[in-house]
Amino acid sequence: MVSGDVLKLECGALVVGIPAGGLTPTAEALDKASEGVVSRWIEAGDIHPCVGKVAVFRDFPGCKAERVVFVGLGKCKARDFQRVLKLGIDNAYLGKEVVLTTLEWLPDEVPEWIAEQSGFIACTALDRPKNYKTFDINWKKPKNIDLYVPDENKDVEKA
């Protein structure tokens, strides 16, 4: 688990949720640091809040992550969580260290449940075997997947 300023996290990929009708705290921080780029790209359709829509950007302004992976959350339903998270991780595959901001994705769910589900999906992604018939020979899976813990969820670190 990692904490601190999400904009200063040096990682291969930062997976950020985009709910319908608003922004998560991490998306807001990225929007502010980039002088409104996130909001403009949502309006332009480059980033879409529909469930399962993914947009990947390299060298995002104001962020130290190599890539920022925006994942559409729709109306933030628990039933979509695993599928959406898997899409985010699959699109962050080139990042050797991936940071998930999933504790912000479902504000009405218990943070411990979100952390447990995130861990399950992350372990599945790290353990999947390389199948060179299916994937390109240069395909690289993440070496490490961390859960970002915002300050208001510090008690989740203990769980």
Placement of each model-derived feature along the sequence:
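Glycine-/small-residue-enriched capping loops at alpha/beta junctions
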Residues: 1-159
